[in-house]
Regions:
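Short glycine- and Lys/Arg-enriched binding-loop motifs that mark or flank ligand-binding interfaces
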Residues: 13, 42
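Electron-transfer interface patches adjacent to heme c in soluble/periplasmic c-type cytochromes
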Residues: 21-39, 52-139
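Short Cys/His-rich Zn2+-coordinating modules
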Residues: 43-50
């Protein structure tokens, strides 16, 4: 538990120095359709990606911050779209959906590039975020 608190504090300090994120980077461009696939298969693929630290350059995965629901705020109990403090403070976005949250995390904590909007990876991670959200809300 102490390790998670230390990691959370380090992440907060890291994010505080990141400045801002252009909202256009985390908003689906007009005319670009999402990848369509079986939701169960996408969520299963998303779970593997959730644990993949190679998606970014920071050496962390989604699970690095959120193992066992760590670092989720109470607002995560609400279905998307909803306000996320990190996205609000760094991009002035009042509300974001799960797909946008994936893109935001790709850019900020994971220090990677946003995923292609029509990619299976983005659809899979967004599907798995839905699973994580439902599990967290049920606690």
């Amino acid at each position: 538990m102490k390790r998670h608190l230390v990691f959370g504090a380090m992440l907060t300090l890291t994010l505080a120095g990141c400045g801002s994120v252009d909202p256009a980077l985390v908003q689906r461009p007009d005319g670009v359709a999402a990848f369509e696939g079986d939701p169960v298969e996408l969520a299963e693929a998303g779970e593997a990606l959730w644990n993949d630290a190679s998606l970014g350059t920071a050496g962390v995965s989604c699970a690095s911050c959120h193992v066992g629901g760590a670092q989720f705020k109470d607002s995560f109990r609400q279905p998307y779209p909803h306000q996320v403090a990190m996205a609000k403070s760094m991009s002035d976005l009042e509300s974001i959906n799960g797909e946008q949250m994936v893109q935001f995390c790709m850019i900020v904590p994971m220090k990677g590039e946003p995923l292609a909007w029509d990619s299976r990876k983005l659809a899979a991670l967004a599907a798995y975020v839905d699973v994580e959200q439902r599990n967290f809300a049920a606690k």
